[in-house]
Regions:
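P-loop NTPase signaling cores
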Residues: 4-228
Length: 228
């Protein structure tokens, strides 16, 4: 599965992306502090999606992004949705890799050209934290070296927050995947044809409010609520 332009070849990472079933819209921030969420609640801060940052709707200091969040909070889903949205735009060509199936990824495996058939390549590498020890260090060295050699290339990585490596990824802008807000949970409940006010009252009555911050658990709660 290869695409070429002017003799430049993409060796690996091309796939036909699909929309994520039951996707819940997520937002990212470059500010990990509590103040960021407070400003949003007060209506003083706009929220931005990962695609906003990648495509330049929201400016960043670099064209390379590493997305951090805790384990099992939706990073892989977010990158899959990003690839789908980029593909659907017709302007971008997402080239994606999952580290768990590419533990020995080398820079020679990665795209050589910024554009293919008029579309801008976006290199997406999911779950750097799937490997550890020397394999992790080797992977970071390959990715960091590739980023240095290709300043023009848009790149998006994902990684658990406790695996942060500022020095090896100094060319990357750090973004953090936000937890779902109460309004996000309400909106998704309504989308699932649930009375959002009653659902939220049930959540708080049963002290389950921490679970609605995570898309997976929110979906499970709504399934349980609908089946009660």
């Amino acid at each position: 599965n290869q695409e070429t332009r002017n003799g430049q070849r993409i060796r690996r990472g091309l796939t036909k992306h699909k929309a994520v079933d039951g996707y819940i819209r997520r937002f990212c921030t470059s500010d990990q502090s509590e103040n960021n969420f407070i400003y949003y609640v007060l209506g003083k801060k706009e929220r931005h999606t990962l695609a906003d940052y990648v495509t330049g709707v929201e400016e960043t200091s670099t064209n390379k992004i590493v997305l951090y969040s805790s384990a099992q909070t939706g990073k892989t889903t977010e990158l899959k949705q990003l690839c789908w949205e980029l593909q659907q735009s017709g302007l971008y060509l997402p080239v994606s890799f999952e580290v768990r199936t590419n533990t020995k990824l080398k820079r020679d495996d990665l795209p050589e050209s910024q554009y293919v058939d008029g579309r801008e390549v976006v290199l997406v590498i999911d779950a750097l934290d799937e490997v550890n020890g020397q394999k992790y260090e080797d992977l970071l060295e390959e990715i960091g070296g590739y980023a240095y050699e290709h300043p023009e290339m848009k790149m998006v990585l994902s990684c658990r927050s406790n695996f942060r490596r500022e020095r090896q990824l100094e060319l990357f802008t750090e973004l953090f995947l936000e937890e779902l807000s109460i309004d996000d949970a309400r909106d998704y409940a309504a989308k699932r044809e649930v009375n959002s006010d009653r659902f939220m009252r049930s959540v708080f009555a049963n002290q389950l409010e921490d679970f609605i911050k995570n898309p997976f658990f929110l979906s499970v709660l709504i399934d349980a609520y609908k089946g009660k």
